[in-house]
Structure formats: structure tokens, C-alpha cells
């Protein structure tokens, strides 16, 4: 399965939670696409498989629509590691460079962060890295390259981000367009509720 490049609002409607796109459009029509209005007095019962698939899709799209093969590789690595599989899976996703760029406030969405990384706007420890899936480690310095610092896009994104939303495993130096990875993320707060245990069960079916 390739990466979905269509409207994320439609994906949000299908999953029933906002994973991207237009929040206003989702709030106005938060029922699955293809339905002409809401189904009144009747709730579609999902199979056990469909429920678990839906949780996996939520997490995939929350992190910008990661390809299925790549997402499965993350899961396999987490499953092989010692410790809580679900927690390790989230840690691997959080340590992606595009996610860190988003978490620091350089981008408004993870999709935007992926594009900005690909276009070579960021340095990691002084070297340009244009691979969105690049995995950061504690001590890594992520900074905006000099040529990009006058861009209104980055200034606007940083100004609009509430400093309190930056997780405690990251540190932002807004004046110097620089962030630092302090530690491996432990308490990970997702923007939407995701039952990671159901994702583990999905890959065990």
C-alpha cells in the first residue's frame, strides 16, 4: 500500500476522528464519506478485524500517513525489542525527524513537516538531513538552515505554536531556530485517542 496523498478530511470522516485536513469541514460533516446525511437511530457494528484495522489506520494517518510497509517495520522492530511493544512503537514514531520538526513548532502539521524536511530546510547536528523518517537520538540538535530563517512560513509557525504544547523530551530555542532532543520520549500524548493494544492484536490476527 502506497502513501495516501488525497484529502485528509475524507480520511478523518472515515475514521471518525480528526487526523488532518480541514477541521471546520470535519466538524460540519463528521460522518463517513458517501453517506447523504447521518444514519439516524442506527449504528453500524464493526467486526473485530475492522475495529483493530481502524485503530492502526488512526495511528498511521496521525503521523502523516506513513506507508503501510514502513509502519509494519516499526511494529516489527517494537515487537522484537524488550519492553512494552505499544510504548516502543510510539517512541519510534515520535523519534522520526518530521515528527520532531512538527512537535517543535516549525510546521503546523506532520504532512507539512515531511515536505519541509524533504526540501532540505533542516540540519541535524550541523548536517543537512532530508529524510523524514530519520531517527533522532538524545543530544541531537535540529535546526533550521540559515537560508530558510527569513521565511515568513517558519516565523509564523513558531509564533503560532503554544510553547506549552512542546513535549518535555524536546527543548526549543526559538530565537535561534533550534531544537534539542533531551531524552527518549516516555509519556507520549497523542492528539486523538488511539488504543495501541488493538494495533498489537491486529498484527497478531
Swiss-Prot record:
User: Which positions make up the signal peptide?
Assistant: none
Q: Which residues form the S4 RNA-binding domain?
A: 95-163
Which gene is transcribed and translated to give this protein?
A: rpsD
UniProt key word Protease = no
What function is annotated for this protein?
A: One of the primary rRNA binding proteins, it binds directly to 16S rRNA where it nucleates assembly of the body of the 30S subunit.
The record's section on Pfam families has: Ribosomal_S4 (PF00163), S4 (PF01479)
- Which residues lie in coiled coils? none
Q: Which domain of life does the UniProt lineage start with?
A: Bacteria
Q: Which GO terms describe its cellular component?
A: small ribosomal subunit
NCBIfam families attached here? PRK05327.1, rpsD_bact
Q: Which PROSITE patterns match?
A: RIBOSOMAL_S4 (PS00632), S4 (PS50889)
Q: Does the keyword Ribosomal protein apply?
A: yes
Please name the PANTHER family in this protein's record: 30S 40S RIBOSOMAL PROTEIN (PTHR11831), SMALL RIBOSOMAL SUBUNIT PROTEIN US4M (PTHR11831:SF4)
- Name of the featured protein: Small ribosomal subunit protein uS4
Amino acid at each position: 500500500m502506497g502513501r495516501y496523498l488525497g484529502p485528509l478530511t475524507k480520511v478523518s470522516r472515515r475514521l471518525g476522528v480528526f487526523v488532518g485536513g480541514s477541521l471546520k469541514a470535519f466538524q460540519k460533516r463528521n460522518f463517513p464519506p458517501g453517506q447523504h446525511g447521518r444514519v439516524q437511530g442506527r449504528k453500524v457494528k464493526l467486526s473485530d478485524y475492522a475495529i483493530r484495522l481502524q485503530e492502526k489506520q488512526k495511528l498511521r494517518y496521525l503521523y502523516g500517513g506513513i506507508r503501510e510497509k514502513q509502519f509494519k517495520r516499526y511494529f516489527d522492530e517494537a515487537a522484537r525489542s524488550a519492553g512494552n511493544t505499544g510504548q516502543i512503537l510510539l517512541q519510534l514514531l515520535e523519534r522520526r525527524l518530521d515528527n520532531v520538526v512538527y512537535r517543535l513548532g516549525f510546521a503546523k502539521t506532520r504532512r507539512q513537516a515531511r515536505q519541509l524536511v524533504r526540501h532540505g530546510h533542516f540540519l541535524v547536528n550541523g548536517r543537512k538531513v532530508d529524510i523524514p523518517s530519520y531517527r533522532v537520538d538524545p543530544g541531537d540538535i535540529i535546526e533550521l538552515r540559515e537560508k530558510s530563517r527569513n521565511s515568513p512560513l517558519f516565523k509564523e509557525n513558531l509564533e503560532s505554536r503554544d510553547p506549552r504544547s512542546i513535549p518535555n523530551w524536546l527543548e526549543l530555542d526559538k530565537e535561534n531556530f533550534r531544537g534539542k532532543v533531551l531524552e527518549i520520549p516516555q509519556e507520549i500524548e497523542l492528539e486523538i485517542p488511539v488504543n495501541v493494544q488493538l494495533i498489537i492484536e491486529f498484527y497478531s490476527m
